[in-house]
């Protein structure tokens, strides 16, 4: 953080990323097993809708192995200056995410949000509760979400905003992403996609809504990349240039919260970070099954930061398991609900600081309560199918540090009771290795994927 009264400084450039160019001649691509149209579009730096249109695909999800796709030429655009918009710590739900009282801010601005409510997961929530729920779930800074809402729809300060945006305040029209909560969820996906894509060097260009391909300035930071990608999904080229300029979204953020770089925490994730000791999430002597290799920590856009374990016995959804998911380390429970439990390992109660563990698919019955102090091996709850897509009862665990989702594939894999995670890069496919023994994940129970502490 910048000390009060000291001058504002220009953020330093990040180390440049390598940038390949856009296609110069049309190409053909033969669909392989496991391909998705979105991934093919990203690989060739073209707009997915344009790719579908050129190939007359009425259902983008119905690709056939061996099918030949024509890759259309993109509309190349010049790179834009490397203007940093926000630091990384202001994109994620980091150590200072709770600095702003969201409820008080919304009421003080007396805009549309001040009287807004929505039913989410069966509960009626006010606007502050909706924003905080979406922010914490996706690990996105609530200040960023509020500033984007204000920039796109004026919902924070205008009591009577444009009625055409009633159910889509970001201007993204989709039957699923309907209402404030789902719109925030959609925004989080775009922000995370840009942030972690830039972090992992998986993206080099933004594909705008008009099909333009804009090379990313190699010196921007991941937080800025997240914001640039958000606007890329909504804008044509001229609108995008304005939105990512100092006179665009940055000006709205600065007006609401001051210079975002005053709140920068750098580095957010130290290069020499070491995972603390963690145990497998079940009791000593028990045999569970490694059912899911590295896959999305949360929704689309997050890294492959989660792995799955299923208990012994019948694991059909709808049944109950009396097996116990346990604490992987000492900590305090900061949040529960809709299948989730968050365990804060530094014990300060701030989900955005230090190490935090997400447990997903924890049954409501016997689930641990917020504020409970736990020691390694203490009960969290029972594995189930609650809280999202699941083909059988299991527990999904993922890690965050200072609000950033950590990959289970990279230099900091899971180490649970000495079992170290690895993956192929294909979602859900991976291994656990300990003392030369290698377990391969399997969606079921087999001698080849059974694991013990």
Q: Which residues are covered by each model-predicted region?
A:
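Short alpha-helical segments in extracytoplasmic peptidoglycan/chitin-binding modules
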Residues: 31, 35-54, 66, 135, ...
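Short glycine/threonine/proline-enriched tight-turn/helix- or strand-capping micro-motif at secondary-structure
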Residues: 270-273, 277, 288-328
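Acidic, glycine-rich catalytic/binding loops that coordinate metals and/or anionic ligands
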Residues: 276, 319, 369-375, 398-453
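A structural signal for short beta-strand/turn segments enriched in small hydrophobics and glycine
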Residues: 290, 331-333, 371-383
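Zn2+-dependent peptidoglycan hydrolase active-site motif and core
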Residues: 320-370, 392-394, 398
